[in-house]
Regions:
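Domain-level signal for soluble alpha/beta catalytic cores
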Residues: 2-381
Length: 381
């Protein structure tokens, strides 16, 4: 029973009161193996063996810390998003002069995406085998699959890209592009569902950009209608949710950038709150709330019956927050959303790219133990 909220209860389905965004710091052995593979010193098969061994350790560590659903830490990825998107049918990863967004105080390797054919998803996508492998390692424990939101493909290829030229199929037909992307995700969802997936998280930085005044100004000056783009993205998400099996939970994580503890967007949720929270039918939102860059809780007034996973604990630093302050912020959020619609997690993953954030593995796990202790105090064991 909760010590603070008499009516607070635990949850037995995703998202959980104690949850995570998904990525973890890569162990040095994995970083070394990836470097050796890129240099040709070991084979891809050798790298996979190292990945398998490290993911198996990670899965056990997640179980031991009390997580109800485990991830592979995104250990097989370079980026949180490009690896998945570039392997879609009709998409190609290309070099770029600069990364599509500028992080504060740091630079990312310049890669981007191009749409070269009809968008689709096939069973040859490498994430299918990755999921099978993780499912075996997890055993009876639930697996959580994290992939970039469909919005990200459209954002990178058409909105951020100032030189975007649609292929013939999508010329003067953005609606067809939106539908093809959504249909590809529905195909992916169904394939993963057949493999046992019941917990799917869509990671998304588009909404973080749409919260930022400077980003909104830049896009508007280019003649882009951000309000319509936001509605288009909700359309894609709702088309996917409408096609999902009843026992599959689909959540979305909204991010403002997470590369080596840096960020690229700032601004509260108010500009997107009514469109996203009021109309998007996902089962839950993982929301960054670890700094004043995320604004206050007032935008949560648009939440309907979804779960809101409060990202009150930063993953950008190893320093532990003050427990009383975190509980006070949960109480503040509960003024807008019922306590039984709230959960707690880190603000983002610990390593959205293979470089990872600036903290140690020990600090990473202490963060999760800290979150679990707060969850037990607020919602009970």
């Amino acid at each position: 029973m909760s010590k603070l909220f008499p009516n607070a209860t635990i949850r037995t389905s995703a998202p959980y009161r104690f949850d995570i965004v998904g990525s973890f710091l890569r162990p040095e052995t994995l970083k070394q193996a990836r470097h050796q593979c890129s240099c040709g010193d070991i084979s891809c098969a050798d790298l996979t063996q190292v990945e398998d061994a490290e993911i198996a350790k990670l899965v056990e560590h997640q179980k031991n810390v009390g997580l109800r659903a485990v991830t592979d830490g995104e250990f097989r990825r370079t980026f949180w998003h490009l690896d998945f998107l570039a392997a879609l049918d009709g998409v190609k990863e290309v070099d770029a002069e600069k990364f599509s967004v500028q992080f504060k105080h740091d630079n990312v390797r310049p890669k981007t995406l191009k749409i070269v054919d009809k968008i689709g998803f096939s069973e040859s996508h490498p994430f299918v085998e990755h999921y099978r492998s993780l499912q075996k390692m997890a055993g009876e424990t639930e697996v959580k699959l994290t992939i970039p939101s469909p919005s990200m493909l459209h954002l990178i290829c058409t909105v951020r890209a100032t030189d975007y030229q649609p292929i013939e199929r999508y010329k003067d037909n953005n609606q067809l592009l939106l539908d093809d992307i959504a249909d590809a995700y529905i195909d992916a969802m169904n394939i993963f569902y057949k493999l046992g997936c019941r917990n799917l998280q869509l990671d998304d930085t588009s909404w973080g950009e749409f919260c930022a005044e400077d980003k909104r100004k830049t896009y508007t000056e280019r003649g882009l209608d951000l309000n319509q783009i936001a509605k288009d993205y909700v359309y894609m998400l709702n088309k996917i949710v409408a096609a999902k099996p009843a026992d599959l939970a689909i959540t979305m994580h909204i991010c403002r950038g997470n590369f080596r503890s840096t960020w690229f967007s700032a601004g509260g949720y108010e500009p997107i709150a009514e469109t996203l929270f009021g109309h998007c039918n996902v089962d839950g939102f993982f929301l960054e709330y670890d700094s004043d860059r995320a604004g206050d809780f007032k935008p949560l007034r648009f939440i309907k019956n979804q779960q809101v996973v409060l990202g009150l604990i930063t993953s950008k630093s190893g320093e532990l927050e003050n427990c009383d302050e975190i509980i006070a912020r949960i109480k503040e959020a509960a003024q807008y959303v019922d306590i039984n619609q709230l959960c707690l997690s880190p603000q983002c993953g610990f390593a959205s790219t293979e470089e990872g954030n600036i903290l140690t593995e020990e600090q990473q796990w202490k963060k999760l133990e800290f979150i679990r202790s707060i969850v037990e105090e607020v919602w009970g064991k």
